[in-house]
């Protein structure tokens, strides 16, 4: 349970794998997913490593599978996913897989080539069929006298004078419909109006044999005179990618050709159907095994990639690897190595040897489906340093609670909870569907965050007594107006006063606090906002200071664990004193005033703001301002002096002690060896004992002795000054930052009230017969706006503000976030279908 609050303890281990067993051992480690391999060949080009040929073969198989997958998806065939996790094939099985994939690829390419040729032939015959059909109509129109008059410009004047018969040449073809207007203008300009074009649309779209898209085309016939115009027309048709077809001149020949074309189309359609059936059978057979093939190939590829990270022994019989792994999983890792050795048939066992290192290990926080989302929220700010306190367990409660303080509405909380419950209940089915929608996937990953946000919103909504901007009268109001009529309000007062105030000092008016939350009578009061603003503002300050103080307290656990006594005495203690003497005292004042003053003494209750300002100014001369309690002046002066003392305590003392320790080590001749200091001085982070940790995160090179420790007093003073100023000013600014809890809560309540008043109230106010029908549309609009504005937009706003309060105001008190994530070699992503590497 303790590891939940810190990252797992990691160790660097060395693996000695026999060459014949290395493949199977790495395979078992990939199934386990608990080791992160280090690259022991950083200076070797990826194309010069030992297993580069095997990687290329896997990539070639992967390419063939992607081709098959593309063809399967193009045919709208679903890929079978049984959730099976196939075992990694042995290296000797790669030849069979390659042959199988090669056979499928060649067969599919042959089918596609033949099918494309058949479809192209089918398209040509179909176009010819429409040409023969349409041209007959064109030739029938040639007998029309109007056509002769329209085409008279095609004849030479001498021929017209001699009354020679009209002898015109023609070409017929098919062109894309959208090119017709440009095509017609080009013919007219190039041929100077000496051609006659007739065109008709083909009603049914034709299929492009290459892309498979539907294309709309038109049939055209061009009449001209002379070979020169004929050549021009053909060149223009070629430029516009029009398909020209031979068309007989006599009706009888056209009829005979049409009959032959129809017969060939029928035969070709039969062949096309048979080809498509065969293609479907091949693709359906491939679709059944495609996912398994993908997993096998990509597991093999991942294994060979990992083997390329290892060193080869000089005898070529052993591979040496270095891995980061959790100490708690060493037994399971050794068991996986034994299992891999047995599968390979090797008689020499693999060896796991723990290594001593001064390099910073990666950070590994174990998660489950519930804590996964909260850990991601923390990691988005920065990966925690190795073994420091993990904020995620505390964030599980504080994050949804602070969100709910801003979002608090009973009705909206129920809607959010129902949505989260739906995702949680159906999570298995949703996971199996592998939805690609990025927005939904993101929300589904945070389903438990949304669930807790909804539950806490219900809780805070009950405290605020706010449900869709309306109060719930669950227990009956504790206020009564009847005593005011009998004892205080006269008839004359009632006639001339529009706003009346209930006096809690009158017996019977106020009967004690409401059992839970805000009394519903406040929803009717004109000073509702005044009361709620005061309550929420003070509550925000109290919650914020408690949250920050808890963050400072967590820093103590880090200092104790890392054995840094200087940070405790010169960091944690003055920080905690500074926080509690000023802002902790403010919380006590707020609670004290709530308890010390009731309705009868509220008129003389002093202002906390004035008292708090006077506390810093040491201003107590104003006798008209009553004290909150006896001895207040002396206590407040003492608290301010303590807070002031904490500033030089944090600023000056630590650099001086570090300098004194450095001079003492230098005098005694103490040196650093391999990053580990040998001497009498206490361990301290600012002395930079392990100097090359940051470099090791990037270089991952072999361990080298660290250089002799260098201490710069000026840098240390500047660093400490920045930290002190940041903390002292941060306490003030961060406390003010928590007022966003009040501001967003107010905004959400006001938006909810506006939406009810402007939409739902209007629908409920209609008294006519059509009011019921109108209410249906009004409620639809109300529900849509509620979800879009109040749940999604306002919810996202509250989410981001709660995130900021955790990242900045809370985590900066104890969380370094300068580590790097543990990225184990694992087949999990491959099993889940996330094939992209």
Curated annotation (Swiss-Prot):
The chain crosses the membrane at residues 389-407, 410-426, 442-471, 535-554, 573-593, 639-658, 725-749, 771-809. One of its GO terms (cellular component) is clathrin-coated vesicle membrane. Keywords: Cytoplasmic vesicle, Hydrogen ion transport, Ion transport, Membrane, Synapse, Transmembrane, Transmembrane helix, Transport. It is a multi-pass membrane protein. It comes from the Eukaryota. Residues 408-409, 472-534, 594-638, 750-770 are vacuolar. InterPro entries: V-ATPase_116kDa_su, V-type_ATPase_116kDa_su_euka. It is found in: Cytoplasmic vesicle, Clathrin-coated vesicle membrane; Cytoplasmic vesicle, Secretory vesicle, Synaptic vesicle membrane; Melanosome. The keyword Mitochondrion does not apply. One of its GO terms (molecular function) is proton-transporting ATPase activity, rotational mechanism. Residues 1-388, 427-441, 555-572, 659-724, 810-837 are cytoplasmic. Subunit of the V0 complex of vacuolar(H+)-ATPase (V-ATPase), a multisubunit enzyme composed of a peripheral complex (V1) that hydrolyzes ATP and a membrane integral complex (V0) that translocates protons. V-ATPase is responsible for acidifying and maintaining the pH of intracellular compartments and in some cell types, is targeted to the plasma membrane, where it is responsible for acidifying the extracellular environment. Required for assembly and activity of the vacuolar ATPase. Belongs to the V-ATPase 116 kDa subunit family. V-ATPase is a heteromultimeric enzyme made up of two complexes: the ATP-hydrolytic V1 complex and the proton translocation V0 complex. The V1 complex consists of three catalytic AB heterodimers that form a heterohexamer, three peripheral stalks each consisting of EG heterodimers, one central rotor including subunits D and F, and the regulatory subunits C and H. The proton translocation complex V0 consists of the proton transport subunit a, a ring of proteolipid subunits c9c'', rotary subunit d, subunits e and f, and two accessory subunits. This is V-type proton ATPase 116 kDa subunit a 1.
């Amino acid at each position: 349970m303790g590891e939940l609050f810190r990252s797992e303890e990691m160790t660097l281990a060395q693996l000695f794998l026999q060459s014949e067993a290395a493949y199977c051992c790495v395979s078992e480690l990939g199934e386990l997913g608990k080791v992160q391999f280090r690259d022991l060949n950083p200076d070797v080009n990826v194309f010069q490593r030992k297993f580069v040929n095997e990687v290329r073969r896997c990539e070639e198989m992967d390419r063939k599978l992607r081709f098959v997958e593309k063809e399967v998806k193009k045919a709208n065939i679903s890929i079978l996913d049984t959730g099976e996790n196939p075992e990694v094939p042995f290296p000797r099985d790669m030849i069979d897989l390659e042959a199988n994939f090669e056979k499928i690829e060649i067969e599919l390419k042959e089918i596609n080539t033949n099918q494309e040729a058949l479809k192209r032939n089918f398209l040509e015959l179909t176009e010819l069929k429409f040409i023969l059909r349409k041209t007959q109509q064109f030739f029938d129109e040639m007998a029309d006298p109007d056509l002769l008059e329209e085409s008279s410009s095609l004849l030479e004047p001498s021929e017209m004078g001699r009354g020679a018969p009209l002898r015109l040449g023609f070409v017929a073809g098919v062109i894309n419909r959208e090119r017709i207007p440009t095509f017609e203008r080009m013919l007219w300009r190039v041929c100077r109006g000496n051609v006659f074009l007739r065109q008709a649309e083909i009603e049914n779209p034709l299929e492009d044999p290459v892309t498979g898209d539907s294309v709309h085309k038109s049939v055209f016939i061009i009449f001209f005179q002379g070979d020169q115009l004929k050549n021009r027309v053909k060149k223009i048709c070629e430029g516009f990618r029009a398909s020209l077809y031979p068309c007989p001149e006599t009706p009888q020949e056209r009829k005979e050709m049409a009959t032959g074309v129809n017969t060939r189309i029928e035969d070709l359609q039969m062949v096309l159907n048979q080809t498509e059936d065969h293609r479907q059978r091949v693709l359906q057979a491939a679709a059944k095994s495609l996912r398994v093939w993908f997993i096998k190939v990509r597991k093999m590829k991942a294994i060979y990639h990992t083997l390329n990270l290892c060193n080869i022994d000089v005898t070529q019989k052993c591979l040496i690897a270095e891995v980061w792994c959790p100490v708690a999983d060493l037994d399971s890792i050794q068991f996986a190595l034994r299992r891999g050795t047995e599968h390979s048939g090797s008689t020499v066992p693999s060896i796991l040897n723990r290594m001593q290192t001064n390099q910073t290990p990666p950070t590994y926080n174990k998660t489950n489906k519930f804590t996964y989302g909260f850990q991601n929220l923390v990691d988005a700010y920065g990966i925690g340093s190795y073994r420091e306190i993990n904020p995620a367990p505390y964030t599980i409660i504080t994050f949804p609670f602070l969100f709910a303080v801003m979002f608090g509405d009973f009705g909206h909380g129920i809607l959010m909870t129902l949505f989260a419950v739906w995702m949680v209940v159906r999570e298995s089915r949703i996971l199996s569907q592998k939805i690609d929608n990025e927005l939904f996937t993101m929300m589904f990953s945070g389903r438990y965050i949304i669930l807790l946000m909804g539950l806490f919103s219900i809780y805070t909504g009950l405290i605020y007594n706010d449900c869709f901007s309306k109060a719930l009268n669950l227990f009956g109001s504790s206020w009564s107006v009847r005593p005011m009529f009998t004892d205080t309000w006269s008839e004359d007062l009632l006639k001339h006063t529009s706003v009346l105030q209930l006096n809690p000092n009158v017996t019977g008016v106020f009967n004690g606090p409401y059992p839970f939350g805000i009394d519903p009578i406040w929803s009717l009061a004109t000073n509702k906002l005044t009361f709620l603003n005061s309550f929420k503002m003070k509550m925000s300050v109290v919650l914020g200071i408690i949250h920050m103080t808890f963050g400072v307290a967590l820093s103590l656990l880090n200092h104790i664990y890392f054995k840094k006594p200087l940070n405790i005495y010169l960091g944690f203690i003055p920080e905690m004193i500074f926080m509690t003497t000023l802002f902790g005292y403010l919380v006590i004042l707020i609670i004290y005033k709530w308890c010390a003053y009731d309705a009868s003494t509220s008129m003389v209750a002093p202002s906390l703001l004035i008292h708090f300002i006077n506390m810093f100014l040491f201003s107590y001369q104003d006798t008209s301002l009553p004290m909150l309690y006896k001895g207040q002046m002396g206590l407040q002066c003492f608290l301010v002096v303590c807070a002031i003392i904490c500033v030089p305590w944090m600023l000056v003392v630590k650099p001086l002690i570090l300098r004194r320790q450095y001079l003492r080590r230098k005098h005694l001749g103490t040196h650093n060896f391999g990053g580990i200091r040998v001497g009498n001085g206490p361990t301290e982070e600012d002395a930079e004992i392990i100097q090359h940790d940051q470099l090791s995160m990037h270089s991952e090179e072999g361990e080298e002795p660290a250089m002799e420790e260098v201490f710069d007093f000026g840098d240390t003073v500047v660093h400490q000054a920045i930290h002190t100023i940041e903390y002292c000013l941060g306490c003030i600014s961060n406390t003010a930052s928590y007022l966003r809890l009040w501001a967003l809560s107010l905004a959400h309540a006001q938006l909810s009230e506006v939406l009810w008043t402007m939409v739902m109230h209007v629908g409920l106010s209609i008294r006519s017969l059509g009011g019921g029908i109108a209410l249906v549309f009004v409620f639809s609009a109300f529900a849509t706006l509620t979800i879009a504005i109040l749940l999604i937009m306002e919810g996202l706003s509250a989410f981001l503000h709660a995130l900021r309060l955790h990242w900045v105001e809370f985590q900066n008190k104890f969380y370094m976030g300068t580590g790097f994530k543990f990225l184990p070699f694992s087949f999990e992503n491959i099993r889940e279908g996330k094939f992209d590497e």
